[in-house]
From Swiss-Prot:
It is found in: Cytoplasm. This is Fructose-1,6-bisphosphatase class 1. Its EC number is 3.1.3.11. Substrate binds at residues 115-118, 211, 277. Its cofactor is Mg(2+). The gene is fbp. Mg(2+) 1 binds at residues 90, 112, 114. The keyword Secreted does not apply. Homotetramer. One of its GO terms (cellular component) is cytosol. Mg(2+) 2 binds at residues 112, 115, 283.
Length: 336
């Protein structure tokens, strides 16, 4: 039986689910950019891409060389194809305008070019996260400048989302709103090949991911919930849990999509004015779309993440996502 490449899968989606051709082409371009980023990541010190740039992004985070390179790869790959009206990146202050010499398309691309970049220098998994939205009609004119407001749509408006994870294998995990598929990069073929069909998250789990070093800063509902997880069989939840933490959302969520679990990045008392650390547009929305399509759930502790109306490109949010049973429990504790 012949293997199903990403291109073939997207063509079949065009036939069976009326996926627009422009969206298919856009996903293929993003996938090609991810292959290029994967190649750069795999070269490591041999490619001269390790270390920091000595600059900070809009988040106040020190930019790694690969952060900047990955951002440039995604911009250059996608700006000329005629599929996009604009782009927004975690590494850039403002929305990216499609140069006037190129045609505009009907979609907006939002991305974190290299999630978990603190892992680069220790050779641990990193990844690229992306989200696709439809551009509002008023911005589709060639003469209309694109501004931030075009992107400020709730996660329910996403038409596609996914991530590439650069680990022992490079994988692309994708949803077009009809379930979640996983594609592994065959380096000999140069193609992403469908290897994981109908990825599904179990409703219950015995695994969770959280940065325990921040425990003293958590709010009371999170303190209570995690203490119950750690209490194991002797505690109120009556079962033992294992904790995992890779310090890259893309890696932790990939594990949860693969075998179940709960990912938590709650707000804490160090910056009470901020509702969380992770970015709604670049990280929480695309990952929540994937998790829900795989049968899981995602909230900020109070409401469904995909229902949140963004107020800014770089808005932050608390995140609880993964197996439905545990997400529901953590959310219920916040409401008591």
């Amino acid at each position: 039986m012949s293997r199903v490449t990403l291109s073939r899968y997207l063509i079949e989606q065009t036939r069976s689910n009326n996926t627009p051709a422009d969206l298919r082409f856009l996903i293929e371009v993003v996938a090609r950019a991810c292959k290029e980023i994967s190649h750069a990541v795999s070269k490591g010190a041999l490619g001269g891409v390790l270390g920091s740039m000595g600059t900070e992004n809009v988040q106040g985070e020190v930019q790694k060389k690969l952060d900047v390179l990955s951002n440039e790869i995604l911009l250059e790959a996608n700006e000329w194809g005629g599929h996009l009206a604009g782009m927004a990146s975690e590494e850039m202050d403002n929305a990216y305008q499609i140069p006037g010499k190129y045609p505009k398309g009907a979609y907006l691309l939002v991305f974190d070019p290299l999630d978990g970049s603190s892992n680069i220098d220790i050779n641990a998994p990193v990844g690229t996260i992306f989200s696709v939205l439809r551009c509002p009609n008023e911005y589709l004119s060639q003469n209309e400048a694109l501004d931030e407001k075009a992107f400020l749509q709730p996660g329910t408006q996403q038409v596609a989302a996914g991530y590439a994870i650069y680990g022992p294998q490079t994988m692309l995990v994708l949803t077009l709103g009809h379930g979640v598929k996983g594609f592994t990069l065959d380096r000999e073929m140069g193609s992403f090949v469908l290897t994981h069909e109908d990825i599904t998250i179990p409703e219950s789990t015995q695994e969770f991911a959280i940065n325990m070093s921040n425990q003293r800063h958590w709010e009371a509902p999170v303190q209570r919930y995690v203490s119950e997880l750690l209490a194991g069989e002797e505690g109120p939840l009556k079962k033992n849990y294992n904790m995992r933490w890779v310090a890259a959302m893309v890696a932790d969520v990939h594990r949860i999509l693969t075998r179940g679990g709960l990912f938590m990045y709650p707000r804490d008392s160090r910056e009470p004015s901020k509702p969380g650390k992770l970015r709604l547009m670049y990280e929480a929305n695309p990952m929540s779309f994937l998790v829900e399509q795989a049968g899981g759930a995602s909230t900020d502790g109070h409401q469904r993440i995909l229902d949140i109306k963004p107020e800014g490109l770089h808005q932050r949010v608390a995140v609880f996502l993964g197996s439905k049973e545990e997400v529901a429990r953590a959310t219920a504790y916040h409401k008591e």
